[in-house]
């Protein structure tokens, strides 16, 4: 490549431009472009490339949210509250799983989407729940927490190796 001339690539259309610029498959880009238009698709593709927050779920069977926030803040972690009661974002998560609070099971590292699955299901005490694709166990333990460790949860996963993870996290 010449230092004097910048490399220019001409793409066929907006779908190709967006797909290349945001590093998404063409079929994915085309689907949203055709259904929702260029501006929505740009926003969606850009959002897909953003780094998600580091989220933890408070284990309310062992500690309340405010106490965990206080403990983690005093330990030097910057905590951002979310609109969801027992989900917190940790802005500087390095070393958080080495804390006594993690060791004692006061929180579980879990993506907000997974937290919301259990939250929206909203099982009551003594419920019976079938958790498919349960590994590594975050949703399973959250369901148990929401059920106050009562009821029955059947946790399944197609991978035998992943079943071990569920047991370790229980």
Please state what every model-predicted region is.
Residues 1-170:
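S-adenosylmethionine
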């Amino acid at each position: 490549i010449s230092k004097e001339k910048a490399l220019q690539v001409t793409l066929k259309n907006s779908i190709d431009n967006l797909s290349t610029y945001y590093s998404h498959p063409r079929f994915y880009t085309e689907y949203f472009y055709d259904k929702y238009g260029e501006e929505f698709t740009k926003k969606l593709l850009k959002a897909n490339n953003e780094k998600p927050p580091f989220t933890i779920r408070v284990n309310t069977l062992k500690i309340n949210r405010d106490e965990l926030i206080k403990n983690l803040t005093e330990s030097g972690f910057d905590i951002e509250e979310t609109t969801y009661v027992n989900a917190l974002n940790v802005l500087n998560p390095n070393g958080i799983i080495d804390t006594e609070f993690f060791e004692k099971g006061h929180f579980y590292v879990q993506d907000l989407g997974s937290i919301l699955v259990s939250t929206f299901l909203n099982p009551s005490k003594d419920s019976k729940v079938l958790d498919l694709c349960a590994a590594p166990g975050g949703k399973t333990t959250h369901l148990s927490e929401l059920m106050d460790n009562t009821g029955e949860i059947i946790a399944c996963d197609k991978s035998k190796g992943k079943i071990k993870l569920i047991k370790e996290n229980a």
